[in-house]
Each structure stands twice: as structure tokens, then as C-alpha cells.
Amino acid sequence: MIDKMKQVTFDKVDDALWKEVAIKSLRGQPFEKLISKTSEGIEIHPLYTKELLEKTLGDKVEKITNTVRQTKKTDTWIIAQATYSESSEMFMADLTDSLERGNEAIVYDGKNNISWTTESLSQLAELMLIYPVYAFDLKAEDEFVNVFEMIDESERKKVQGVVTGNNIKLSKDYQKMRTLSLDAREVHLNGSDIITELAIILAQAAEAAENFTNFQNFEDQIIVRFAIDTEFFLEISKIRAFRVLWQTFAENYGYKGYSSVPIHSETSLRSYSKLDEYVNLLRAGNESLAAVIGGTDILTVHPHNILTGSNALSRRYARNVQLVLKEETYVDDVIDHSGGSYFVETLTNEYIEAAWDYFLEIEELGGYSAFINSGELEKRVKKTREKRFSDIAHNKKSLIGTNVYADLSAPIIKGDNPLEIAHRLAEPYEKLRAYFEEKQPKIVLLTFGELKDFKPRADFVKGFLATGGLDVEFSPAFKTVKEGQEWIKTTEFDYGVICVSPKETEEVVNELVEDLPKGKTIDIAGKYTGEEASNWKNAGIADFIYKGQNQIAKLNEIKQKWEEVVKHG
């Protein structure tokens, strides 16, 4: 039987036949509907093939994969759990505990600087001889820097890692310590696209390299930092593209052989939300896997509740994300997991070419500092950021638990953290949820007909309003319009939405508005335009609520109208 099975063959399906079947499934809509675009405008096709890859990239594929694999020095990565505490004693206790439970590095954020005791620094110095240290954004007055003076000169060559900050200078004895950070996180968190992130890293490098006479000495001093978002394949391609771009950059400085710099990635707070915080754990898992498959060397996973204040349990969850990846997926046994993927190779090349061109534009404008001072970067980032917020508001992109599937039973946790950033995608929803948690208007869904007919629209409206923190009640299912009119007249509510099946909406609303009580804000579920919509508004209907509408604008409109009613009694 098995020999017979081995003889089974399958007909080869060519692209043309696949496309023909795909077009039929679209039922008259154009094939181009299956093509989406990234925030940079790069087209994402529904199918990538070997033939298409060879046609568009040719021998570039081999060059890309060779570079990615040769410049990744190990097949694993360092688990770098960040430690945040209010005192040096707590910091050391938390750090020691995390190192015993799977953390592989000492991570200190100078933005959350604390006062250090001599005893704590002494304990830290001992650990630095065993574990790599990543201390970022230090200020000259930060007491943390004193630890480097406490390590015996004969032991300093054992210390490895990174320390960055203003006017931070280390003894030459620290031969394995890097002091320069090429950082794309700021533009990323402000809403940037991947092409801009990559180009900015190269521009920073070009400016910093001017202070060195030898490229190898320069390379030995730097680390590259990325924030990794939830766009899985795009983020994989970002890290891969950087390795190729860096090799090209190094070769232009006369470097021979393969050039490699360590990449430190962290989960992106741009995608984190204070709402339904456990969803952040899913985002962190997605982002972590993308970073690892992309080839990061060091990875920091932020706890799911980092925006409101992490605790021992959430830090454990964050650490376990990486431990699960290492122990249960074997991703640390392979270099360049996605190499050869038609989609990833194509996307990687797109980023390489576009980022290099943009980097050259920046250089022509005078380099990194001149470009920053010109305001051109902020203009570009702002445009991308506004598009991101618009996509979230119009539900073109999903933030689970925030702009879709909002859980009103989940408590809104209040709290602050030094890692709070200015342009998180969830912020507009968080503000609305916080507002309506304090005071809630009475909202009624005015349902007409059979449950099976009005339920789809009623469920949509309920979910739509929940994203802003608004709870709803259902009216009785009115069998007649007159029954609905009487109920509306005799029932107190602040805002109502008429929910009827699409087929019956026109008939029901036309009759309903003939005797609609004044002074009540009532919308219709569904998108209606033209003369019909105008007539309904003239008859007392306030507006409409529909799929694809700007949620934030609509929710703020409801909020504003209710505030006016409350204000004027």
C-alpha cells in the first residue's frame, strides 16, 4: 500500500489557473482587491511564487540570504529582562530573582534612575562579571555609573554589554563594552514606517562614524535598537533588511568581509493598550517571535501591564514568553528561519532598496542632524502616524480589546509608568473609556421586527459603542412602528439607535419619523446618504452609525451631544 501511495502525483497548478479561480471567488470584484499595501505603500500580493521571486530579484536572493546568515553570529539570542524598581535594594532583589528564573542579562533604564547604595552597587559589580549588562540612556549624575569604578582593573575585561548616555566615558579596560546606540525606537514610537526607521539608523551611523578613523573601532562601539510591532512579516523583514543594509554601509567604508553589529529589540509600546491588558501579552508573543525569526541578538519583552505599573507576576509572564520560545519551539537552533520564503525575501528586498534610497536623500540634505533640524523627519512621521490613527479609528486595522471586541466588564486600571509614550494607538479609546467610566448616559437600541433580522445591526452597534465605554440596553422587539413610537414617547433615555434589518429600514423609519418625539437624540444603524438621509434628518433623526465610520469622531460626537443635554438640563 505504501509503495502505491508513493507513486501518487498531483497536477501542477500554474499561476494563471490559480488567478482564474481567485477571480471567480471574488464574484465580479477586481483581482486588485486582494492586493493590500503596507504603511510605506509597498504592495502585498495574495500569492508569491518561486518563479516570481526569480524574475523580480534574480541573484539578489542568494546575496540577501548569505549576508543575513553570515552577519548573525549565533543561532540564539539573549533574554534581556528589564528591571524597574523604586530603590537599589528592590532592583537587586528583582534582578537576582529574574536571573535565577531564566533572565540572561542585566538591563537598566536610565529614564527610571534610582538612588544606589554602596552595598547594592557591590552586588551589581559581582553580577556584571557573569552576565552581560545593558544600561541605556544614563545621565552623568546617575549613580549607576559608579559600579564601573568598583570592578577591579584585572576583572574589567570580563564585563561585556552596553552603556549609553550623555558624557558617559568608560576606562579602556572595558574592552567588551559598547557605548554608542543607533536607535530607531523614537521614530518608531512616534508612528514611523519601517523604511524611515532603517534609513534613520544608517543616517545616525554615518554621522557617528565621522568621529572614528577606523571603521572596525566604530563598529565595536555600537549597538542597534529596534522596537518590534505586531505586523509580523514586516518586522521580520525589517531586521533582515537591516543586516543587508549594514553590510552595504560597511563596504562603502572600505570594510572587508562580513560586518556585524548586535541588534537589541524590544516589544513595541506603540501597540500596547491600557484596556484589556492581557491582550498585550498576545501582542508581546507575536512581536517576540517576529524579532527572533528576524534575527535579533538581544530581546526585551515588556510586561503586559507596563503602562499602568508592572508587578512580579507580569514580569514573570514577560520572561516566560521568551523561555517558551527557546524551550518549546527550537527557534534558537536555526539561523534565518524565514530565509527562502518568497514573501519575506521579496519584502526584505523592497525595504533594502527603499531604505537605502531614503538614506541617500537624508545625506544629500546634510546628514542626520541637519535632517532632524529641518523638520522634514517630523513631517514624514506625522503623516504616517495620522494614517495609523485613521486606520484604527475606521477599523481598517484592529486593536483587539480596544477598537474591536471591547470588554466593558474588564476594569480600567489607572497608573503611570516611566515608559509611557505620547502616541500610542489606543490612547483615544482609553480617554473615552475613562470618561464614560465616571458617568454613563442611558443608551437604548430601538429594535424592530424579528430577533434574527435586527440582531446583526444591534450587535454591531453594541460593539461599536463599547469601544468608547458606552453600555447599551435593548428595547422590546417592536412588532409595529406604532408600538415603537409609543415606547419612545414614554421612556427616558439619552441616546437611541434604531436597529432594523437593511430591507425594512426605509419602511420602518419613514413611518417612525411621522410621529417622532422632539428633543431625543436618535441615530439609525446603517449607512445612508443622499435625499433619503437628508429627509430623515429633517424629520428628527440625528445621524447614522455604520461600519467603516470614524469611531473616535462618532463617539466624541455622542459625548458632546450628551454633555450639552446634561449642561442645559
Model-flagged regions — what are they?
Residues 1-231, 261-262, 310, 451, ...:
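Catalytic alpha/beta active-site cores
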Residues 8-11, 29-30, 35-36, 45-47, ...:
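Intrinsic disorder at enzyme termini
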Residues 17, 21, 120, 146, ...:
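Exposed alpha-helical structural elements
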Residues 72-75, 222, 265-268, 337-339, ...:
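A short alpha-helix capping/helix-coil boundary motif
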Residues 219-221, 258-260, 296-298, 356-359, ...:
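Active-site lining segments that contact anionic ligands and/or coordinate catalytic metals
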Residues 225-257, 262-414, 543-553:
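Active-site capping/gating regions of soluble enzymes
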Residues 306, 341-346, 445-451, 484:
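A short beta-alpha structural unit
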Residues 322, 345-348, 352, 359, ...:
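Generic hydrophobic alpha-helical scaffold/packing signal
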